Each structure stands twice: as structure tokens, then as C-alpha cells.
Amino acid sequence: MEGKIRIEVLFPEIANLYGDLENIEYLKKSYPEVEVVETHLTGEPEFMKETPSLIYMGTLTENGQRLTVEKLSEYTDKLIEMINEGVYFLVTGNALEVFGGEIEDVDGSRDCGLKIFPTHAKRDMMNRFNSLYLGRFEGMDIVGYKSQFTHSSYGRAGVYEGNSIADLYGNFDRKRSAPCCGETFSIYR
């Protein structure tokens, strides 16, 4: 990122399920020169006026996912354009599912995503997956957790045989697909 760093936080009023916004607070305190703008569900995304250095979106409830898809659906072309231009995205938890094809419930009902990435998620609200990670990384103790109702896969069948993430996104045959790679779009769960 060159020049002034501008971070746009999408929908902080609903995309903060696990306190994800503290990531942004940490950045603001570590780098006071960073400008942080927030886009709320009731407003137009700031990225329509000025392209940010980074777009951040935190974990959502299932209804929050629906509201986010509804809101961002009219901006899909701009999102794809920004991905292709190398704008960085940091998306936490289940928010990535918003950018995928669909979220399928065990009862067969489906919520559509933005269809930017060729992912498919299966949701089972009666069986939450929880895990705790205790380990070390570069000499530091790490504690992490994972708590989710969904499991995502690439493509409908969850089978991918390419050589890289760039192959996956670059070869996704869709009229408005975004040939992008993991260098600009990051997630963690």
C-alpha cells in the first residue's frame, strides 16, 4: 500500500459478532496516521466515492449475511473491479460466505451470495463446530478459537484440482468472475 492508508469498515453495526472490530481499534492505535471510515447498512459504501487501501468486514449472524448480500448486490461490479485492481480485503469468520455462490441449510433452503468467488457453504444450525487452538508461532504463544455453523468449499462439489488459489479464481468460468488471488483477499476463521 502506497501513500495514505485508508481502511473502510463495512457494516460495523452487524459485522462484529465476536468483537472483530477490535482488530481495527488495534490498527488505529498502532498506526494513528491510518484513516478509518465506516459504511453502514443505511448508507452508500464509501468505496463508491474513493477507493480504500483495505476493506474490512467482520463476522456476521445468518440474518446479517442476508442483509449484507442484499446491500452489496448492487455493488458487485465495483467489488470485482477493486479486487482486480489489487485493493486489499480482510474478511473475518463467516463473512467470506457473502462473497461466494450460496449458503445451503440442511433443510435444503438456500441464501444466495454475491457470486464473486466459486464457493459453496453448508449451514447446520443444530450442530455448531467449536475448537480451541493452543500453540506457538515464531516464538510466541498463540491462542485461537473457531466457532461456526457453516463449512465452506470451493465449487458445488467441494473438489478443486488446480495448482494454486490464483488458478482457482482465474479459471472460474463466470461472466463476471474476478481473476484474483490470495494476495489481495485474506480471511481467517
List each language-model region with its residue ranges.
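N-terminal beta1-alpha1 cap of cysteine-dependent amidohydrolase-like domains
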Residues: 1-81
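Short, well-ordered coil/turn elements that cap or connect secondary structure elements
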Residues: 2, 31-33, 84, 109-111, ...
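Amide-donor transfer/coupling interface in amidating biosynthetic enzymes
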Residues: 2-3, 124-189
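Hydrophobic/aromatic beta-strand patches that form the interior of the parallel beta-sheet core
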Residues: 8, 37-39, 90, 115, ...
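A broad, low-specificity signal for short, low-complexity segments enriched in glycine/proline
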Residues: 11-21, 51-53, 93, 97, ...
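Fold-independent oxyanion-binding glycine-rich loops
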Residues: 12, 39-41, 58-60, 92-95, ...
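A short acidic, often aromatic-flanked loop/helix-cap motif at beta-alpha or helix-coil junctions
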Residues: 43-47, 122-124, 153
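Cysteine-nucleophile active-site neighborhood
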Residues: 62-141
